[in-house]
Amino acid sequence: MIILVLNCGSSSLKYQVLDMKNESEYSLLAKGLVERIGLEMGEITHRVPEKDKHVIDKPIPDHTEGIKSVLELLVDAEHGVLKSLDEINAVGHRVAHGGDLFSESAVIHSEVIEGIEKCCELAPLHNPANLLGIMAVRSLMPEIPQVAVFDTSFHQSMPEHAYMYAIPYEYYVRDKVRRYGFHGTSHKFVAEKSAKLAGLDFNNSKIVTCHLGNGGSVTAICNGKSVDTSMGFTPVEGVVMGTRCGDVDAGIVTFLQSKYDLDVKGVNDVLNKKSGFLGISGVSSDARDIEAAAKEGNHRAALAMEMFRYRVRKFIGAYAAAMNGLDMVVFTGGIGENDMSVREDVCTGCSFLGIDFDVEANKVRGEDRIITKPGSKVVVTTVTTNEELVIAQETMRLTTK
């Protein structure tokens, strides 16, 4: 079964074409990135395994034209991987926000589209772009089944006391202001993968997953269900991130608004685009640049990394308390998979939980491995995530029922 996976942003779209033999056996046929949609000149980077990348510069006025260009590439005589577009069996979309309307992935039809539209208010940067991708496929390939896989769905199992904010209840009833959480597709995938690696029963274990990259979140998974997560109403809550502040006293917002006469956009820019690693270090939003600057003696860069590691440790400890125990900690994402020093610092700071860290086993980047010693009460793993594969798996599951 050949599935096209799409992840549409406001001015870009990522794509993968996977040939799914079954849920666990698959091959990647092609992947790529369409950038600068709506600008004077766009760019498509198309990659086929074991071939040189193919780059095209051309105007791409909208998402429909972007997806049309991708489809043309997939059947191109020189760079294509399909004989005909009829070989594509289904399309899976990453959708940022499903609110409390979608607790699982859904086959896309008119009611699902209406539901995604209702959630645009909750994710104004992402959901409209996701919808553009869905509507573009509808116009180009009207007969093909489409599936929406929501970033928020996995966290819909959180109990009320975990997802509610202690603000007037009517804001929840009227405006759906509550904690939703994100990266759900990744958290579930790496938790299941790590449980299998460690020989644990995913549905009978207490697991903390740390998806750490330019955006980052930590999730408590108890017996296969998300029971708490660090991101909240928006992806700005939680750990320190590349340009996002993470947890912050709400009073700071009104203080900055009053003192500097900031409007809503101004405050949003501060919290989402000027904070985190970038705001503290003044160097970069990239953890690799921060660590390099810290090694050269830059105090602010070192402070940014220590704040980040401290927050992650706090969440692991808090979630162990929330679940009344801990069996496994999982690291994934760009930082989680590749930054040995972050994993070591976080884990040695949590040794009281029963983590017997293995420094030698930790010397790995981008591989799946247990990084605690045999007999450690709490198992720690580092594993690669693959959100596109999960989207393809969900698409296959829902379209072959």
Regions found by a protein language model. Give the residues of each.
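Glycine-rich phosphate-binding loop of actin/hexokinase-like ATP-binding domains
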Residues: 154-259
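Adenine-nucleotide phosphate-binding core of ATP-dependent small-molecule kinases
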Residues: 269, 276-280, 287-322
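Catalytic phosphate/nucleotide-handling subdomain of diverse soluble enzymes
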Residues: 221-222, 227-263, 269, 333-364
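Internal helix-turn-beta structural module
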Residues: 302, 306-327, 336-401
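Phosphate/pyrophosphate-binding loops at sites that engage ATP/ADP/AMP, CoA/4′-phosphopantetheine
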Residues: 73-88, 196-201, 316-327
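N-terminal glycine/serine-rich phosphate-binding loop of ATP-dependent small-molecule kinases
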Residues: 1-99
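Glycine-rich beta-strand-to-loop/alpha-helix junction loops that act as flexible
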Residues: 9, 93-97, 212, 330-338
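Short beta-strand-loop/turn "lid" adjacent to the catalytic site in phosphate-handling enzymes
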Residues: 74, 78-126, 147, 154-162
